[in-house]
Every structure is written in C-alpha cells, then in structure tokens.
C-alpha cells in the first residue's frame, strides 16, 4: 500500500506495484509543539484528504502530566521531549491547523499514549520498564507500536470501508482508532518543542516496556487462528508506516509536497541507499541511516555520527538493531522486538563490540541517483562517503569506498568542540595528498582554501587515502597500522620532481643531437667564438636514413646499408627517377622505397667515391684524442697519415657537380621592410640580419661538401669562420648577375641595393667593388658549374698564418677541388691552351674576392664598435664572430691564399 510518510493520510495502492523503500520517518521533530502549545482549531473535514483523521491528542492524564514535569531520568531532554519517547508526526501541509478531539469521540482517531522512552541525548540512562499497575495503553506492545486503524469511517474512502467490511474487522478497527488518535495528538504537541531526531532509542525502551503489560489486542489481531484478509494486512502496514515503524515505505511524493529536511531518510529517497548488514529478515529492506542538519538545529546536538551514509546519523553507538520474527510477521509489516534488547545505549562500554562487525570499506552503495547534499561541518563527523555515480563505470567499484578523515580539516572548518570520536589533529596529516586546491578538488587535508562541500569541489577523484592510525582506530580497534591503499585500476599521478632532483646536465640522448644548430652556448676555454657542437654536433646516426652509423663512408657518417647502396648507385650507370616530386622521405623503414631520393640525399651528405673512408667511428675518435694529447710532441700526428686520394677524373662525369647542385642553399630573405624610408640604420641592420641567416646556410652547405667532414673539427670551424664573408660576397655577385644583370646588388629578394641605397648605406665604395665583381661574371661568361666549383674552392682559400691542426690534409683537399675545377674547364674545351687561359681567368676572379672581403671585414668591425651610436642592430652570432675572428684577419694572423702574386 502506498502511504505518504509522516503526513497522516493513506493513499490508494497502485495496481501491481509494491514500493519498498527505507525504514523512514521513525520519529520526527516535536520541539515546536511543546514550545508553542497554542489553542487548536479543528480542521475542516471538507478539505481533509482521506486519512487526515490521523491526528494527535493532547495528554490529559494527571499521571502523565506529572511524568512530564518530573521525568524519571532527571535529564533536561526528558522535559523537552514530553512524556513519551515518541516523536510527533508532523502535518506538513497544514501545520497550524490541528484537530482537537476528546477521548470520548471515536471519530477523533486519536491513539493512546504509549510508554515513556529514554532520553534522546547521548549518554542518558535507560528508562526502566513500566510498573505492572501502569495503564495498558502505555504498554508498547507490537500492536500498539504498529498503531490501530480507523474505526471512524466518515472521513475514510469507500475502498477502505469495503475492505474492512469484507474482512469482518470493522469493530476491531474502531476500537483501535481511538488509541491511534490519542497517540497522534500527543505527538503533535511534542512536535513543536523538540527538533532533535532520535534514531532508535525510543523503540528500544518501548520494547522493554512491552514485557510489563500484556496486549490482548495483539493476541486477538495477530493470533494463529486469525482470519484477517490480505487487504486488512495491507492496511495495517499502511498504519504502521504512518507511525514510522513499518518496513515498507513510500518512495514517491505527491505533487506539490517536499521531503522533510529533518527526516532520517530524507537523503536516501533519491536512490537505493546503502544496506546495513543485519541478521533480521524483516529488516532486510531497511537502509542506512542519514540525518541532515536542519537550519533550526540546536548546538546541543552533539550525538555521535554513524558510518552508514555520506550524511550523518546520530545516536548510533550501541549495538546493531536486532529483531526477531517469522516470515509471516515480516509479510504483515509487524516487528517482534524482544524486550531484553536495547536499541540505544548511553554508555561507551560496548563501543568496540558495536564496531567490530562493520565493514567500513565495502558498503554496497547505489550507482545511480541524485548527488548527496553537502554534509555539515561538524567536529565529530568522520565519514566521507564518495558517490559512485560521480565517476564512470570503471571507477564504480573503486569509488564505493568509505574514506576516513577529520571532517573539520577535510571541509576546511574551524569548528572545535567536545567530541568523543574526534581524532587528534595529527590524524589528518597522514592523508595521501594527490590533489591541490588549484585543481578544484578536496583531497587530503583541506587546510583552508578548499571547498567545503562536494558540490563546490566537484567529483572527488577515487584515489586512496591513508587510514589514520589514531582516532577511530582507538575506539573501534579494527584499524591496522597506517597504510596507503589505492583502488583497483588507479594509477598514481606522477609528481613533478623537486628542483633538487632535476638533472641540470644534458643526458646522453641530448649529446647525440644532430640538429643543424646544435648547442648555441659558447666555450670560454677556446679562442674561437662558437663551440664545435654548434657547427658539427657529434654524429652517431646515419646522415641518410637515421639508422645507427657504423663509420664514415665515402666522406659521410652512414650506416652499412647506405654505404653499400651509394657504392652500387654511384659506380653503376643506371639512372634513377623519382615517381613523386623528389621529396620522398628517407628513413630507416622507407629508405628502399625511392632510390633516386636516397642517392640525392647521399650526395647532399657529402658522399663521393673518391673521398677517404674511415674504418670505424671509434677510430676517428681515437685519432682525435691522439691529436689533442700529442699536440706539442715532435712525433707525427696520426691523423697526418691520412691521405686523400685524388678524385678520379672522368670525362664530364656529373657526380661531383650533382652533389654541388644538390647542396646549394636556397633563397634567403633579409626581412627588410621596403615600405619604410631608407635609412642607414635600417639598411645596415637588415644586412646584418641577412648575414646571420646566410651564415646558418653556409654551415649546412659546408658540412655537405665532399671531404669536408674529414677535416679536423677545429679546422672545419676555423675555415667557416674565416671564409664566410668571401662566400657571401661571391654568392651575392652571382645572384646580381643572374637576376638583375649586375645593375644592382641583389643581396636578397627583399633587399636590393640601387645607387641611392649604396650611398645611403655609407659603404658606397664597397658596393661599387661588389658590383664590379658581379659584372665579371658576365664578362667572363661564368657557367653555373664553374660558379659552384669556384665557390667550393673559395671555402679553402683562407687559413691562419700558423696553419691548421691538420694542414697537410687541408692542402690535399684543396688541391682536389682545384683539379675538379680544371676538369670542369676541360670538359668544355679540347684545346689545352684554351683550358689554361680559362683556368687563369677563373682563378684571377677568385683572387679578386679576397680584397673585397677584407674591406667588408674592416667596415663591419668598425660598425660594430660604434653600433650603439648609430643604432645599428647586430645579431648575437654575427657580433661574436666579428668581435673575435675578424680582428685576426685584420691583424694579419689569418691570410687568404692567392693563386696569383698580388
């Protein structure tokens, strides 16, 4: 039967449905009824719904008045709650309209006064059983606990009258209605004076008092020979539920009604609540306890909280609720409560025994339903229950865990009061904190700054806590030593290392970085500007496919596979064509897909058939170490034994030229804003920016030249730092010849110098000489092949006066490039005299570059000194090279190599 709890009315039962909910509304608040015992006004019968006749009667017995004024336990709570332990059933929709009736009217529907219960406060003595001469109406037998039904049928529905007529229990119900109306009227009076909620204490006392007075109505109503129909039993269930003692509860509210805030099970109606283990079959449907703190609760409510809910159930420190009864009694909604069983104990003697049978970490919680209301900040509460519905299905099992911690620290509260179950402050400090306040989640000690409710903090991630070694463990005795536990499937978040744990030096994987820029830091122990790692970082991977390199093969550091491929492709006469756009990806797994792009990449890396092969990468390292150790010894350097075999000549073989064409740098822009007016500072700043960008391309180009990597690393860097200016001037002259026919200086597509800019830059004389160099390309009809070979030879045309570390190898490499230039000339001309004349012209052109480069060195050095005065910007790398290496050239320590006597 479907019944609205605590509202004193009965509703028809839906067909084929039985709602089983929590054991709800056992007792409700009665403080207002005692504090405001104003006159009662009869409620209009016309507006009363069916079952509204369940009201309470004011007590008139002199003995009960004396008991109310002088309670036997002497506690102040006894005076507040009135003469009985029953709590009023509040009429929520019409709290001010209360029906008054006398005991003589059977239609009043009042109930007799049950026996007095124990005090609701924690730690109060138990109420002794009622004396034998006490009124039978005060003996709370099972029948009186359930409460009778309605004998006055004027306000009852026709269906109920038919049911009662068929069952033959009309007279019995009329007798029991009077007792029920008396009971409800007394509870209505107590409702206005007390708002404390007693969980199970009053029921225990009534069970003890049941032994003092027999109940004849119980025997007659529930006897073995009873012929009451199922419909009558359903009606009994409804009345029992209205009294708060039934095992079946209504789960749906009628429209316009709200759930009471002070109901024990108010927060459990949203979904299937937690089930408390109990051996009693009739209580199998009983759910966990929960109390929500109402706004009007007094500060004296310091009862201990139970562990059944994320909310807080008070007064449960004694034994678990026990009951006995057959399945018949369970089906009829009655409860057999032994008189010897106490439902509430005030002492703390049996606290440990009460908690031994509880499983604090494996409550069967609901996986759906609305979120729980925010728990109050209470110094005695130590339960933090996470709702599994806040997580996904993967977290459901892990989330259904009860987490313990000091509630005051958990919710950031500062409430401190007397508490028997509150742990020391150090208990919360042992929590395993994985979340911080910035993440918007409460986890671990909340120390302020965190949110005080789950709604503010959001769903708490299901990470484990550290169980407090003190606090509840000292009371219940079932906690082991503190240990960090994590639910299944939860991986701990990796924390960021502290600064003391951060490794400052680079690891081995960083040392092998083969990027084009390498390490930009300077080495103060050397006299050069940039470290060798900037230009030539240590290479341990194949330059072609990225696989592990086995050595330097054919002038480049490659693996064995690329070594064999290059040998077969370079020596063979087969021509490879790319099926795509000559931009195929060549790596360890796709190096065999396109032989054409792989061969092109080999040429770009500097591989040539005539280059000297090093046996292994380790041998090169040992040779370099030997050079450093024997730099001052008269013994011959091991690296000097290396000889560079001459590049085998062949008639117009394009392999060498193909390499030079493949590695030629692309177009580089200066980033100059041509919309701004030309000025000295703007033009020179753009030139310096262009010089730094081109220097990066020069480094890449030089490293790809055949045989260049066989030089000593210090020699490689020195050659680039001394010859970069001549290389840029020579390349700019070629661009000016090919793009603007040498009429202007084509530094970059966005930076072209005409006569006006030449004057504006204050380097007109240098610009005139560079333009004259560009015109020489036209006068001599320089071919692209000749330009590429001359540019490569220009790289090896300036050295220090004291020589390089491996001067002999440098001289041999330079001679090979000179011979290549001679072969290129000979490919076009059959007459030896013509070849000699052409060779003379080209070498004279190379010699003319060196004076121009020297003038530019002097100009840039002077400009760097007074750059702060003229507001000219110098990039960092350009400024360092000019300040360190250019003075060596200007002072004569570094001199160019001329083909002809100057």
Curated annotation (Swiss-Prot):
Phosphorylated in prostate cancer cells in response to several growth factors including EGF. Phosphorylation is induced by c-Src kinase (CSK). Tyr-517 is one of the major phosphorylation sites and an increase in phosphorylation and Src kinase activity is associated with prostate cancer progression. Phosphorylation by TNK2 enhances the DNA-binding and transcriptional activity. Phosphorylation at Ser-61 by CDK9 regulates AR promoter selectivity and cell growth. Phosphorylation by PAK6 leads to AR-mediated transcription inhibition. Sumoylated on Lys-384 (major) and Lys-503. Ubiquitinated. Deubiquitinated by USP26. 'Lys-6' and 'Lys-27'-linked polyubiquitination by RNF6 modulates AR transcriptional activity and specificity. Residues 534-901 are annotated as: Interaction with LPXN. GO terms for cellular component: axon; chromatin; cytoplasm; cytosol; dendrite; nuclear matrix; nuclear speck; nucleus. SMART domains: HOLI, ZnF_C4. Residues 35-146, 194-224, 439-465 are annotated as: Disordered. Residues 554-644 are annotated as: Interaction with HIPK3. 17beta-hydroxy-5alpha-androstan-3-one binds at residues 688, 735, 860. There is a cross-link at residues 828, 830 (Glycyl lysine isopeptide (Lys-Gly) (interchain with G-Cter in ubiquitin)). Binds DNA as a homodimer. Part of a ternary complex containing AR, EFCAB6/DJBP and PARK7. Interacts with HIPK3 and NR0B2 in the presence of androgen. The ligand binding domain interacts with KAT7/HBO1 in the presence of dihydrotestosterone. Interacts with EFCAB6/DJBP, PQBP1, RANBP9, RBAK, SPDEF, SRA1, TGFB1I1, ZNF318 and RREB1. Interacts with ZMIZ1/ZIMP10 and ZMIZ2/ZMIP7 which both enhance its transactivation activity. Interacts with SLC30A9 and RAD54L2/ARIP4. Interacts with MACROD1 (via macro domain). Belongs to the nuclear hormone receptor family. NR3 subfamily. In the absence of ligand, steroid hormone receptors are thought to be weakly associated with nuclear components; hormone binding greatly increases receptor affinity. The hormone-receptor complex appears to recognize discrete DNA sequences upstream of transcriptional start sites. This is Androgen receptor.
